[in-house]
Regions:
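A structural signal for short, well-ordered beta-strand segments
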Residues: 23, 77, 93-95
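Short, charged/polar surface micro-motifs in flexible loops or helix N-caps
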Residues: 26-31, 40, 51, 70, ...
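Conserved Nudix-box catalytic region and its N-terminal flanking loop in Nudix hydrolases
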Residues: 27-66
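Nudix hydrolase/Nudix homology domain
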Residues: 41-43, 107-154
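A short coil-to-beta-strand element that immediately follows conserved catalytic motifs
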Residues: 71-79
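Active-site-adjacent beta-strand/loop module that shapes the phosphate/pyrophosphate-binding cleft
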Residues: 82-102, 112, 116, 130-138
Length: 154
């Protein structure tokens, strides 16, 4: 396997994936930070594409701050989620707020602290599960979806 990984590969033979990061920011009262995306109006976790020069933890802290104005301490990886339609692998981390003030950005039209029930009401299943997985303490979870529905493992 190591020999295979060290050999140059044809561009068409190796599938390319985008790596994104997202933060499940949990306040002491149990409310969860969410944004309404500016591009499509859906409610999701704050997050985005991991930059080449940053660690996943630094990336999630940057994305949460950029989209919400909230600084966070990153606790732990709670899930890995693959969008099989778009080729995106999302690393999701549970975080604690450590400062800042809620604000919108060019990527968000609303920032809100939701209860777990509100998460299920406002978010599509494939995004709500990321928050609910982070709360159950049994992670990290590994799941796949097609952008709309979870895909059963196996």
């Amino acid at each position: 396997m190591l020999l295979y990984m060290s050999q140059p590969q044809e561009a068409t033979s190796t599938p390319l994936h985008s790596v994104s990061v997202a933060g499940v920011v949990v306040r002491e009262d149990g409310r969860l930070l969410a944004i309404r995306r500016a591009d499509n109006g859906t409610w999701e976790l704050p997050g985005g594409v991991l930059e080449l020069n940053e660690t996943p933890e630094a990336g999630v802290a940057r994305e949460v701050w950029e989209e919400t104005g909230i600084h966070v301490e990153v606790d732990e990886l709670t899930g890995v989620y693959k969008n099989t339609t778009r080729g995106i692998v999302a690393l999701v981390f549970r975080c604690k707020p450590s400062g800042g003030t809620e604000r919108t950005s060019s990527e968000s039209t609303a920032v809100s602290w939701l209860t777990p029930d509100e998460v299920s009401d406002r978010m599509a299943e494939v995004y709500a599960i990321r928050l609910l997985d982070a709360l159950d303490g049994a992670g990290p979870h590994v799941r796949s979806h097609d952008g709309k529905h979870l895909i059963s493992a196996g």
